[in-house]
Structure formats: C-alpha cells, structure tokens
C-alpha cells in the first residue's frame, strides 16, 4: 500500500482542505492518506477552535485514513521545528510522499531553494543576523536573506510557502526518502479575513466570521463540508463555546503577574529582555488583543508573541525544549478501516512505538508537555465539562471511521 502524508491543523476543516485532500489522492495515487495534525494548540501560538478529537472526526469524515498527533513540543514552534517533527513522524509511518498546499504550486521552486539553503546556509544565516541587528522580525530577516542570495522566486511573505520550504529543507537535511509534492492553493489567501469566493475561504476568515458563537455558523456553512458543520454544532452544544485566546487571557494574566522575571526568562522563546515588557504591559491590559498590541514591535511579530504567550500558559521551558528535539512516539488519534489495514501491514516494522494509550507515556518528556497543554486547554471550562475534557485526553481510544 502506498502511503502519502499531509501536515495539517484543520482549524476548522473547510472546502479548501477537502480540495487539497482530493487532489493529493488524485495526483499521488495514494492507497492511504496519513495526516499528522497539531493537537490543541497550533503553530501560530493559539488554541484550536475545537479539540484535537473533534478535528480528527472532521478529517476522518472527509476521507483521511490515519490521523496522528503532532505533539505540542513541535506544533507550537517555528516553521523549521514544526516541519522537522511532522516530517519525522510521517517518515516513521513509511510515507512515500508528502503533499502540501502552497501559494506557489511549483515543487521545483521549493526543491531548488532548499538545496541552495543547504549549500549556502552559512551565508544565509549571516544575512539573517545582519537584518536582525537592524531590528526587523525574523520572518522579514529571512525573506531579505533569500533575496540577497538571489536564491528563490518563492514569495516568503506567504505562510504556506514558508512552511512548504521548511518541509523540503527537513527532508533534504535529514536525507529522508520521501518525495515532496505541492498543490497550489485556490481562491483564498491564508491571511484573508473576508470571503471572496462562493465556496472556498481561509480558516482565518471562517474563524473571524464565526465570532466564537454557534449563532454565526450558517454564515460559514457554504465554505465547510456538512460533516464539519455537524461536528462544530455538536462541540458547541456539548461545551457551550469555541476556543479563542480571549477566554484564556485571565489565566495568562495570572501567570505573568505572579511570575518573577527570572522565571519568565526560563520559558521557551522569552529572550532579549522581552520579559520586562510582558510584566510592564500585562497589568493594565483589559483583553488579550490589547495586550498583544501593547507588546508587539517590529522585532517581535504577533505570531512569535502568541507562541511565547502559549508557552507561558503551558509552562513550556527552554530546558524542556532541549529534551524534546525529536519525536519519541507516534500517537494515533483516529483511523478508517483502510487506515487500520495499513497499520496492520506496517506496525511490526515501525521505528517508533505506536501509542493508543497515553498511560504508556507518563515518563516521556514530550508527553509530559502534552499533558500540561491539555490541562491549559481545558482550563476555560466550568465543571463538569473541564473534567470531561481532561478525561478525553487520558481515556479516549483512537476514533474509528
């Protein structure tokens, strides 16, 4: 059986994701589609709209065969670390190809750029440092470095191009025998906040239109599969809310206000004295959005600051980051009958343990952080919903489609 991997967040699963999934099957001839999916917190440093289990259900309903979790230690990281963890996990399940969506749509451009990076890494890094010393953000410094190298025609202001390049770099750096492939995104840009197409919209615009309430679900219904709509309805009916940063702000405020600056300096991503600014601005900030606007600078992008805030919320330290640099297990979140057949075919040969019960992971540093992330994710619920969500983390077996 030919397995093809995709790297996803599905926040939420929408028609653009369905197009990517169907095109991946068509273009690769895959017998089995394996999705490695971020857990309850995402790469841009924000809580997922609904839990990993609800999003797994969306994925399986749409035709994904196997869903595995990208642990927090890789999911809430820079593009390079995110890609490294995801590619390693897909390789551990013997994926022959990975297929990602991009604004560019030309895989040759990604491969050429990744090769250039490996050949000229020292020069690239030197250019990045020069730009950083001028006070610009890392994404802009990185884009400027590529421009100076005259190394690529990729538009690195586009998030999916950045992630796609990171996937290909990870494959080449690790010398992993996976063939990368890309499908051009259609109709909507990743950052689009409005609807400009009758059936395709970005996840950003869908979350904005939803406004954290089921009352606006019909507004986004044309842009999502019926199974996604049903899952969102069920989640809201069960828990009474969708997850947004504002709901977590009181917990973040408590963490920052009661922590010493020395303690904040131990948190992953807290560098260059940003802890002073965090402590200074948190006191008067009435909302998460107001807090972010008060601490944002040219050097510190919104995304970078959101990741720092998420790490503070989940107490992810620099020391823990050092202990969690490569995946140590494959956590199965769900599978179809076809996915089950594939796993039966390969499970005796897997280089990492395939985990269906997290009780087997209680001493694993990567899972210890995952557990803290689950506690943080559930914190906004009243009882008994909070306890029920935490039980999901420990007791839910892989979902079957």
Swiss-Prot record:
Protein name per the record: tRNA(Met) cytidine acetate ligase
GO biological process: tRNA modification
Disulphide bond pairs: none
Organism: Geobacillus sp. (strain WCH70)
Residues that, per the record, bind ATP: 7-20, 101, 160, 185-186
Enzyme class: ligase
Domain of life: Bacteria
Catalyzed reactions per annotation: cytidine(34) in elongator tRNA(Met) + acetate + ATP = N(4)-acetylcytidine(34) in elongator tRNA(Met) + AMP + diphosphate
Stated family: Belongs to the TmcAL family.
Primary location group: cytoplasm
SUPFAM superfamilies: Nucleotidylyl transferase (SSF52374)
């Amino acid at each position: 059986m030919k397995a093809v991997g995709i790297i996803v967040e599905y926040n939420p699963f929408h028609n653009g994701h369905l197009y990517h999934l169907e095109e991946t099957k068509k273009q690769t001839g895959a017998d089995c589609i394996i999705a490695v999916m971020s857990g309850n917190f995402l790469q841009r440093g924000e809580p997922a709209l609904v839990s990993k289990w609800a999003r797994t259900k969306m994925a399986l309903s749409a035709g994904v065969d196997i869903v595995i979790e990208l642990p927090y230690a890789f999911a809430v990281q820079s593009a390079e670390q995110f890609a490294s963890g995801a590619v390693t996990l897909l390789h551990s399940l013997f994926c022959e190809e990975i297929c990602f969506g991009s604004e560019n749509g030309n895989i040759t451009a990604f491969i050429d750029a990744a090769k250039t990076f490996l050949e000229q890494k020292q020069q690239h890094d030197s250019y990045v440092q020069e730009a950083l010393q001028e006070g610009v953000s890392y994404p802009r410094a990185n884009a400027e470095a590529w421009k100076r190298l005259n190394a690529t025609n990729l538009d690195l202001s586009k998030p999916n191009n950045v992630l796609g390049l990171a996937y290909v770099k990870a494959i080449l750096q690790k010398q992993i025998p996976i063939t990368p492939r890309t499908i051009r995104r259609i109709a909507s840009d990743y950052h689009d906040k409005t609807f400009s197409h009758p059936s395709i919209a970005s996840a950003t615009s869908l979350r904005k239109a939803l406004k954290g309430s089921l009352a606006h679900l019909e507004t986004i219904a044309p842009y999502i599969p019926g199974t996604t709509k049903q899952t969102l309805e069920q989640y809201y009916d069960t828990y009474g809310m969708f997850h947004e940063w504002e709901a977590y702000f009181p917990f973040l405020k408590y963490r920052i206000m009661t922590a010493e600056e020395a303690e904040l300096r131990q948190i992953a991503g807290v560098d260059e004295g940003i802890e002073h600014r965090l402590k200074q601005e948190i006191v008067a900030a009435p909302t998460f959005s107001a807090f972010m606007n008060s601490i944002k600078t040219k050097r510190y992008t919104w995304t970078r600051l959101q990741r720092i805030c998420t790490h503070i919320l989940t107490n992810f330290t620099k020391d823990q980051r050092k202990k969690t640099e490569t995946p140590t297990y494959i956590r199965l979140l769900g599978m179809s009958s076809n996915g089950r057949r594939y796993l039966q075919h390969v499970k005796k040969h897997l280089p990492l343990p395939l985990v269906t019960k997290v009780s087997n992971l209680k001493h694993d540093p990567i899972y210890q952080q995952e557990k803290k992330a689950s506690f943080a994710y559930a914190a906004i619920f009243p009882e008994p919903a909070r306890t029920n969500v935490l039980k999901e983390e420990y007791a839910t077996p892989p979902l079957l489609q």
